[in-house]
Amino acid sequence: MKVIMTTKVDKASMNIMQKLIENFGFKETELKFDGNPVYKKDDMVILTTNDEMIYYDYLDREIEKQLSFKPEIIAFASRHSSKQKLPALTTHVTGNWGEAMYGGKDESFAIAIPSAMKLALLKMNELNDLGWTVCYEATHHGPSELEVPSFFIEIGSSEEEWVNDRAGEIIAETIVYVLDNYENSKFKVALGIGGGHYAPKQTKRALNSDLAFGHILPKYAQPVSRDVILKAINRFHEKVEAIYVDWKGSKGETRQLAKSLAQELGLEFIKD
């Protein structure tokens, strides 16, 4: 089963859920998760919780405990908040390059699924008739303690956008498309290094080439140790083939570390 995760405390999440039910034929079942109705269509279920999803470590175990199945993948339908209030449609994997400020554990990562995130980016970009930004975000916040692949897909960045009907429709359609197609998609998988939080160069590369990013280490989280980068590389569902560096958007020691790791691991080194 493929899981679409939502929460009652998030207006964007509820907007996306409503559009999934209205437009894509999800039907209420007799099952409950965290006390809320479970909706199902084919091999997909919508689950709803009552608190912020970023703190839901071990969600996969909880699903197994309550519903007796292990998810193949979890798509978290969520809001994105930023001070700039940039209208945006974003996707990213979760985890913490350093201290865990917002869920998850320190220096710990969820399992990235680059093919799903790339398909999400491409589909959001294709459907985006709002004129909003479509982008990756760097790896940040929780949950980090999940043993199945997952990704967040978000509407940003203020209440006005969270409740926007068209944004809800775009994300709902994107999620269904991604869950239907990610298993049959083959891209060149890369760890991304450098740039700001919205990973502009990685986003551009993913939209215009066969590169698909999983974990992305932004400049503001640098430097990190070799061990932390290796930890992130080991938390990809698909085999990492390249390390990509936004050269100007990275600190000197991180550039060199990325270069030597690529050599050591036999990965392609892409300098942009």
From Swiss-Prot:
Its cofactor is Zn(2+). GO terms for molecular function: D-tyrosyl-tRNA(Tyr) deacylase activity; zinc ion binding. Binds 2 Zn(2+) ions per subunit. Changing H140A: Loss of deacylase activity. It catalyses: a D-aminoacyl-tRNA + H2O = a tRNA + a D-alpha-amino acid + H(+); glycyl-tRNA(Ala) + H2O = tRNA(Ala) + glycine + H(+); D-tyrosyl-tRNA(Tyr) + H2O = D-tyrosine + tRNA(Tyr). Its EC number is 3.1.1.96. Keywords: Hydrolase, Metal-binding, Zinc. Gene3D superfamilies: AF0625-like. Thermostable. The keyword Acetylation does not apply. InterPro entries: Deacylase_DtdA_archaea (IPR018033), DtdA (IPR007508). One of its GO terms (biological process) is D-amino acid catabolic process. The keyword Repressor does not apply. Changing E154A: Reduces deacylase activity. Changing S78A: Reduces deacylase activity. Pfam families: tRNA_deacylase. D-aminoacyl-tRNA deacylase with broad substrate specificity. By recycling D-aminoacyl-tRNA to D-amino acids and free tRNA molecules, this enzyme counteracts the toxicity associated with the formation of D-aminoacyl-tRNA entities in vivo. Catalyzes the hydrolysis of D-tyrosyl-tRNA(Tyr) and D-aspartyl-tRNA(Asp). Belongs to the DtdA deacylase family. PANTHER family: D-AMINOACYL-TRNA DEACYLASE. Monomer. This is D-aminoacyl-tRNA deacylase.
